[in-house]
Amino acid sequence: MVSHEVLWKGSAERDLKNIDPQQVPRIIKAVESLIDDPFPPQHRKLRASASDYRIRVGDYRVIYKVDTKAKVVTIHYVRHRSQAYRR
C-alpha cells in the first residue's frame, strides 16, 4: 500500500490548542494512521462534500479531505462532536 502525506491546515492546528492536552496524543496517533490508510473502517463520508471524511477519536471528530491522485490527506478541523459539523 502506498503511503499518503498528511497536511494540517492552520485551522486544525489552532483547534488542537483548544483541546484537552490529554486527548491530543490520541488525536495525533489517529491522524498518523491515515498515512497508511486514509479510509480506515471507522471513517465516514460527509454528505455535504464529495471528498470530505471524518474519523471519530473519543468525543472529537477529525474532518479531513483525501486527494487520492496526489496521495495527500489534508486535516481541516479537529473539534468536539457538538461543534464539528457547524460551519
Tell where the protein language model's regions lie, with residue ranges.
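Enriched for short, Lys/Arg-rich terminal
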Residues: 1-7, 11-25, 40, 56-60, ...
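A short, surface-exposed loop/turn module that caps and links secondary-structure elements
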Residues: 29-55
